[in-house]
Protein backbone atom coordinates (compact mmCIF):
# COMPACT_ATOMS: atom_id res chain seq x y z
CA UNK A 1 0.00 0.00 0.00
CA UNK A 2 2.84 2.39 0.91
CA UNK A 3 4.58 1.60 -2.39
CA UNK A 4 1.51 2.42 -4.50
CA UNK A 5 0.91 5.68 -2.58
CA UNK A 6 4.54 6.69 -3.06
CA UNK A 7 4.38 5.77 -6.75
CA UNK A 8 1.19 7.80 -7.21
CA UNK A 9 2.78 10.78 -5.49
CA UNK A 10 5.86 10.47 -7.71
CA UNK A 11 3.73 10.33 -10.87
CA UNK A 12 1.75 13.42 -9.83
CA UNK A 13 4.96 15.35 -9.18
CA UNK A 14 6.41 14.26 -12.52
CA UNK A 15 3.26 15.39 -14.34
CA UNK A 16 3.24 18.72 -12.52
CA UNK A 17 6.85 19.57 -13.32
CA UNK A 18 7.02 18.17 -16.83
CA UNK A 19 7.91 20.63 -19.62
CA UNK A 20 4.35 20.41 -20.95
CA UNK A 21 2.94 21.24 -17.54
CA UNK A 22 5.20 24.28 -17.22
CA UNK A 23 4.74 25.47 -20.80
CA UNK A 24 3.32 28.98 -20.97
CA UNK A 25 2.60 30.86 -24.18
CA UNK A 26 4.97 33.76 -24.81
CA UNK A 27 2.08 35.89 -25.99
CA UNK A 28 -1.62 35.65 -26.42
CA UNK A 29 -2.47 34.06 -29.73
CA UNK A 30 -4.53 36.57 -31.72
CA UNK A 31 -6.03 35.48 -35.02
CA UNK A 32 -4.52 37.28 -37.97
CA UNK A 33 -6.72 38.48 -40.81
CA UNK A 34 -4.96 38.68 -44.16
CA UNK A 35 -6.10 39.41 -47.70
CA UNK A 36 -4.72 37.15 -50.40
CA UNK A 37 -6.86 38.54 -53.21
CA UNK A 38 -8.25 42.02 -53.71
CA UNK A 39 -11.34 43.10 -55.57
CA UNK A 40 -10.64 44.68 -58.95
CA UNK A 41 -13.86 46.65 -59.30
CA UNK A 42 -15.08 49.74 -57.49
CA UNK A 43 -17.67 49.38 -54.74
CA UNK A 44 -20.13 52.30 -54.56
CA UNK A 45 -19.43 54.45 -51.49
CA UNK A 46 -23.06 54.33 -50.36
CA UNK A 47 -22.76 50.55 -49.89
CA UNK A 48 -19.79 50.84 -47.52
CA UNK A 49 -20.13 50.94 -43.76
CA UNK A 50 -16.56 50.80 -42.42
CA UNK A 51 -13.03 49.70 -43.19
CA UNK A 52 -9.97 48.17 -41.56
CA UNK A 53 -6.38 48.53 -42.74
CA UNK A 54 -4.37 45.31 -42.90
CA UNK A 55 -0.70 46.12 -42.31
CA UNK A 56 0.44 43.01 -40.44
CA UNK A 57 3.93 41.95 -41.56
CA UNK A 58 2.79 38.33 -41.50
CA UNK A 59 0.32 39.03 -44.32
CA UNK A 60 1.51 38.76 -47.94
CA UNK A 61 -0.25 41.97 -49.05
CA UNK A 62 -1.09 45.30 -47.53
CA UNK A 63 -4.83 45.71 -47.94
CA UNK A 64 -8.02 47.40 -46.80
CA UNK A 65 -11.03 45.37 -45.75
CA UNK A 66 -14.27 47.20 -46.43
CA UNK A 67 -17.40 46.10 -44.60
CA UNK A 68 -20.56 46.68 -46.58
CA UNK A 69 -23.93 47.65 -45.14
CA UNK A 70 -25.05 44.07 -45.84
CA UNK A 71 -22.24 42.74 -43.61
CA UNK A 72 -19.99 41.45 -46.39
CA UNK A 73 -16.22 41.97 -46.06
CA UNK A 74 -14.25 42.76 -49.20
CA UNK A 75 -10.48 43.14 -49.59
CA UNK A 76 -9.23 46.06 -51.66
CA UNK A 77 -5.86 47.46 -52.75
CA UNK A 78 -5.00 50.63 -50.75
CA UNK A 79 -3.00 51.93 -53.73
CA UNK A 80 -6.17 52.21 -55.82
CA UNK A 81 -7.61 55.73 -56.03
CA UNK A 82 -11.20 54.64 -55.33
CA UNK A 83 -10.06 52.82 -52.18
CA UNK A 84 -8.28 55.91 -50.82
CA UNK A 85 -11.28 58.10 -51.71
CA UNK A 86 -13.68 55.67 -50.00
CA UNK A 87 -11.53 55.55 -46.87
CA UNK A 88 -11.41 59.35 -46.75
CA UNK A 89 -15.19 59.54 -47.21
CA UNK A 90 -15.81 57.05 -44.38
CA UNK A 91 -13.36 58.93 -42.14
CA UNK A 92 -15.31 62.16 -42.74
CA UNK A 93 -18.60 60.46 -41.90
CA UNK A 94 -17.21 59.09 -38.63
CA UNK A 95 -15.61 62.44 -37.80
CA UNK A 96 -18.99 64.18 -38.19
CA UNK A 97 -20.67 61.59 -35.95
CA UNK A 98 -18.33 62.29 -33.03
CA UNK A 99 -19.75 64.77 -30.46
Curated annotation (Swiss-Prot):
The entry describes its oligomerization and partners as: Monomer or homodimer; in equilibrium.
Name the InterPro entries for this protein.
Chemokine_b/g/d (IPR039809), Chemokine_CC_CS (IPR000827), Chemokine_IL8-like_dom (IPR001811), Interleukin_8-like_sf (IPR036048)
Q: Which sequence positions carry the modification called Pyrrolidone carboxylic acid? A: 24
One Gene Ontology term, aspect cellular component: extracellular space
What induces its synthesis? By IFNG/IFN-gamma, mitogens and IL1/interleukin-1.
What's its job?
Chemotactic factor that attracts monocytes, lymphocytes, basophils and eosinophils. May play a role in neoplasia and inflammatory host responses. This protein can bind heparin. The processed form MCP-2(6-76) does not show monocyte chemotactic activity, but inhibits the chemotactic effect most predominantly of CCL7, and also of CCL2 and CCL5 and CCL8.
User: What is this protein's record name?
Assistant: C-C motif chemokine 8
Q: Which cysteines are joined by disulfide bonds?
A: 34-59, 35-75
Report the gene name: CCL8
Which Pfam families does the protein's record reference?
IL8 (PF00048)
Gene3D superfamilies recorded for this chain? 2.40.50.40
Localization, per the record, is: Secreted
User: May I ask which residue range the UniProt record assigns to the signal sequence?
Assistant: 1-23
Q: Which GO biological process categories is it annotated with?
A: antimicrobial humoral immune response mediated by antimicrobial peptide; calcium ion transport; cell-cell signaling; chemokine-mediated signaling pathway; chemotaxis; eosinophil chemotaxis; exocytosis; inflammatory response
Amino acid sequence: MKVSAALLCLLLMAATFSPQGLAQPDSVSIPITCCFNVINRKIPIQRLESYTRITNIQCPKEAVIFKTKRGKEVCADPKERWVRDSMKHLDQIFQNLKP
